[in-house]
Amino acid sequence: MKVASYNIRKAVGRDRRRDPARILDVLNALDADVVVLQEADKRLGQRPSALPPRMIADHTDFVPAPLAVNDVSLGWHGNAVLVKRGVEITGCTRIDLPFFEPRGAVAVEIEGRLRVVGVHLGLLRRHRHGQLRQLRRILTERAMPTAILGDFNEWSKIGGMEELGADFHLHMPGPSFPTMRPTAMLDRVALTHDIDLRDKGVVMTELTRIASDHLPVWVSLTLPDAAAPRAASAGG
């Protein structure tokens, strides 16, 4: 199974143009079974989606997981999950991550075999620590194969993720920010130990370098006790 994460910056590219179609082109090229998005909704008012649902339906093979609390948003606190048509969603959860800088996470169960969690953590490390503690506490209440993906906002390659504890193994697909000259591994993946990581990567193309300020990252996974629903491609 191939799972990807992409901070789309509300579909505003490095050229300062808001271009949802450009983001959808990137998503199509990922060829992923599941894509976790950050900054998928605008910040003001009812937080309307930066990717119009009709465009998603007409121009991709993805279906949004039902995470929004209204008719105009795509996700929760800007976190959204898209799944390929035909991939069964067996559960959805919105998770509050309070503290001074309120954030949220989303959890989507795929075919009862994998829980995909999307996060966009705070800018300050002490807030991130609190958010990770809360997230780990909630997730460990019900054990199942789990992949946490998103913008962890952690610049250090060796610290800052201690609150994940021993339940998760952290993977960094590579530098993904900023797109002009990627140096920071902000976009990461944490897996429970019952999931095998087959491959990982960062998608750097002419399109991804301008479509957002983050590059998409992806992982190819083997789930426990069963073959993945379809053969995952090894590239981005």
Identify the residue ranges that each predicted region occupies.
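Generic structural marker for isolated residues within well-ordered, non-membrane alpha-helices
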Residues: 53
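Short, flexible/disordered intra-domain loops and linkers
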Residues: 44-50
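Active-site regions of metal-assisted phosphoester/phosphodiester hydrolases
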Residues: 1-34, 42-43, 58-59, 63-67, ...
